[in-house]
Amino acid sequence: MEWIADPSIWAGLITLIVIELVLGIDNLVFIAILAEKLPPKQRDRARVTGLLLAMLMRLLLLASISWLVTLTQPLFSFRSFTFSARDLIMLFGGFFLLFKATMELNERLEGKDSNNPTQRKGAKFWGVVTQIVVLDAIFSLDSVITAVGMVDHLLVMMAAVVIAISLMLMASKPLTQFVNSHPTIVILCLSFLLMIGFSLVAEGFGFVIPKGYLYAAIGFSVMIEALNQLAIFNRRRFLSANQTLRQRTTEAVMRLLSGQKEDAELDAETASMLVDHGNQQIFNPQERRMIERVLNLNQRTVSSIMTSRHDIEHIDLNAPEEEIRQLLERNQHTRLVVTDGDDAEDLLGVVHVIDLLQQSLRGEPLNLRVLIRQPLVFPETLPLLPALEQFRNARTHFAFVVDEFGSVEGIVTLSDVTETIAGNLPNEVEEIDARHDIQKNADGSWTANGHMPLEDLVQYVPLPLDEKREYHTIAGLLMEYLQRIPKPGEEVQVGDYLLKTLQVESHRVQKVQIIPLRKDGEMEYEV
């Protein structure tokens, strides 16, 4: 054990650790790029597993030095080339590295979103770990042969490997986060891997490329990229000092909507700033929902937000005055629909409650006929934006919705259109609009009104909807699936959710329970 006190041994250990780290940088870069393909919860485990297997592999190779030496002995010749086992391993590793780096570059340059879970379905944990281990084997062979040529003591070589791998484990997570958060650095690292792969292939054919040339090229590229990252940092600091990220994001969206392209560079800069902003939200959830609703406003028709004629509170034109007064006492609306008789389908117009009150205050008998006003008439296929414009031009807030035969299907108000953007706006005496009634239950399910519009439902429950559908409510969805009126207790599976009919009155679906399902199709809880 006298060698422990030998300064040359310690110098060799330190030198060997440095060399192991230098030779392991390319391995770390490859691990960083591969680990990013996995779901976030598996990335750390993949990195640690890959590096620990690399350490185990290098220790096993060091323990079998006598076998390792035989790898450099010639196996066969082909024309002017002589190949050993080490040369074949270098060739395989070089071609594998060239293939993987080329595929990764193609994915990045073709614009595939590596953060999109739908494009990352093929990334399996052990598949990624296997690729890491294959590259570890190739890089381990190179580093172990270097160690054998520098130090004579096996324990020193093993200690250097353990220390180097431990340092790489500590640096792997921040390196992975840094590399994958800067797209230009990812491209640069993949270019390095191409260079290293090419050098391995050349070395396998017996053409020795001095490592100094490779490291000089890599070092120069890193220096240029460092200057580039510094310039980007200064530019972002300048932009942030003049405008908040929220303002810049808003301007970028508005330029995109207006079709302006002259500030594309600034928009790209804003997008990069958003990526670097992490998980912190620039806009709160209410603002994001409102923006989404505004952008989808012209995709919805008045029939999707109207109040069905069956839910309209109406008054008979010939009703006695006492009945009118009783209706006014319990009424919660500012307008009443006037019908000719008790038939809710024969709508004559609307009267304003305030007009009736003024008539009563003047001591006049209540006369509905002279107070009737004609509302707007919308076809049921009218989009909401033109409807909003008609409300503005006509200076009225009320409209009848009719089908192609002229039959009144329901009513729609300016408040209905406003709620499509801002969400439900209940008045002082109204807890919540029944058409938008949805509550989340303690067991994780939802209870919704059957007449709730599907466009509002998907804000809470992400049901898959057919863009060409001819129905607009939950009840319509159930009837489309069953091809008849549902019965209480009947269930329909839509995507990952089970829709259970709870209440049906007069052939109308009143309440529906929406139950989330597990991926295997079973309920997440007992109903």
Curated annotation (Swiss-Prot):
PANTHER family per record: HEMOLYSIN-RELATED (PTHR22777), UPF0053 PROTEIN YEGH (PTHR22777:SF30)
Family as reported in the entry's similarity comment: Belongs to the UPF0053 family.
Subcellular location(s) per record: Cell membrane
Native organism: Escherichia coli (strain K12)
Pfam assignment, any one: CorC_HlyC
One annotated Gene Ontology cellular component of this protein: plasma membrane
Gene Ontology molecular function terms on file: flavin adenine dinucleotide binding
Family matches, as SUPFAM superfamilies: CBS-domain pair (SSF54631), FAD-binding/transporter-associated domain-like (SSF56176)
Transmembrane segments: 14-34, 51-71, 81-101, 145-165, 185-205
Membrane-topology descriptor: Multi-pass membrane protein
Keywords assigned by UniProt, alphabetized: CBS domain, Cell membrane, Membrane, Repeat, Transmembrane, Transmembrane helix
Highest taxon of source: Bacteria
Domain CBS: 306-366, 371-429
Stated name of the protein: UPF0053 protein YegH
SMART domains linked to this entry: CBS, CorC_HlyC
Location (main, coarse): membrane
